[in-house]
């Protein structure tokens, strides 16, 4: 296992809080300025209990990392409001290029395969660093991948990340299972089945993220979201696969097949994927002066900028919604507790319910 190296960034002692650039039920994200240097950084803050736990986990992960492929942790601040409520704030590197989701939107909803190759290589370098340090990201998707002005890739939003001691956890305990999160439509089948957590889960999510970059859509398509129960069961238990981009080259399709192998033990590892011809295709792509609207990948956890929340008219009846939730509980799958409704594109408030 690689040795942890503490981030050497200096926490700003005097700073100005700017406008809100993101918000969610867990908290808010502000642009901030270091008064000593004039430099910009991102301020994530929360005073909710759920958001506090998420940020605490992100701090615990990020403060021991130092990589050009991971968003930099600058510092943290714990304060108390007038009512005695705790407020936790994180100071993070500001990535001016926005997220991959922003980029895809700015360029018509999808990206060219050669550019995807380039970005995939950057994502793999970030995953390689995390995995060498025994960390599973657990919520890899376009919203949680940030870009600099020159197109450099950095992984962000590690609120769901888990450190695996000895590179594997077998027979996950109840307490550990409850802390595992992610976004269901990007989750590996074995994770939805509440099986062991391993680095292979990130590889599956990488495959889903590549489909997202190539199509501008969720990896399983929009129709799957109309029935949450069927969606989770389909991903977790069927032999079906996300639809691969029809315009992809044979090399690209082969790369996806290596990522989206249902048997996690047969799924390729980061080191193998870095040597795949699909990744080397991106070496010829050079992106200069790359600029898009600057936004955070997400707020306090992937999925706060959620595109979908199941309303009553999307389910046939309240009884159907209740039946879906009960059926998932019976099977020991993951369910969303967000507002009592299931949201497959959000990683917020997903818990394991197996006793």
Model-derived segments and their meaning:
Residues 18-24, 29:
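Protein kinase glycine-rich loop
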Residues 28-48:
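Glycine-rich ATP phosphate-binding loop
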Residues 66-76:
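Conserved HxN/HPN-centered segment at the entrance to the catalytic loop
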Residues 80-93, 97, 101-102:
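A conserved loop-to-beta-strand element in the N-lobe of protein kinase catalytic cores
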């Amino acid at each position: 296992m690689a040795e942890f190296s503490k981030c050497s960034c200096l926490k700003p002692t005097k700073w100005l809080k700017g406008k809100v650039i993101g918000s969610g039920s867990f908290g808010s994200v502000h642009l901030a300025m270091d008064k000593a240097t004039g430099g910009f950084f991102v301020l994530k803050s929360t005073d909710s209990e759920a958001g506090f736990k998420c940020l605490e986990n992100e701090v615990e992960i990020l403060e021991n990392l130092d990589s050009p492929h991971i968003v930099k942790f600058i510092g943290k601040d714990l304060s108390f409001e007038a009512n005695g409520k705790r407020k936790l704030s994180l100071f993070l590197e500001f990535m001016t290029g926005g997220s991959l989701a922003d980029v895809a939107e700015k360029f018509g909803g999808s990206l060219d395969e050669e550019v995807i190759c380039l970005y995939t290589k950057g994502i793999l370098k970030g995953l390689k660093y995390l995995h060498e340090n025994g960390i599973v990201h657990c919520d890899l998707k376009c919203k949680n991948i940030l870009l600099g002005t020159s197109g450099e890739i950095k992984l962000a939003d590690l609120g769901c990340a888990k450190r695996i001691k000895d590179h594997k956890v077998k027979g996950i305990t109840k307490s550990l299972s409850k802390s595992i999160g992610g976004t269901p439509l990007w989750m590996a089948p074995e994770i939805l089945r509440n099986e062991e957590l391993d680095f292979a889960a990130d590889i599956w999510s990488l495959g889903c993220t590549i489909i997202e970059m190539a199509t501008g859509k969720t990896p399983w398509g929009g129709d799957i979201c109309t029935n949450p129960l069927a969606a989770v069961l389909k991903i977790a238990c069927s032999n079906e696969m996300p639809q691969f981009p029809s315009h992809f080259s044979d090399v690209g399709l082969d790369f996806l097949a290596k990522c989206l192998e249902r048997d996690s033990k047969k799924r390729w590892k980061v080191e193998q994927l870095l040597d795949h011809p699909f990744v080397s295709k991106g070496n010829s792509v050079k992106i200069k002066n790359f600029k898009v609207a600057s936004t955070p990948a997400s707020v306090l956890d992937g999925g706060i900028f959620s595109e979908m929340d199941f309303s009553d008219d999307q389910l046939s009846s309240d009884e159907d919604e209740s039946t879906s939730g009960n059926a998932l509980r019976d099977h020991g799958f993951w369910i969303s507790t967000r507002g009592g409704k299931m949201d497959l594109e959000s990683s917020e408030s997903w818990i394991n319910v197996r006793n």
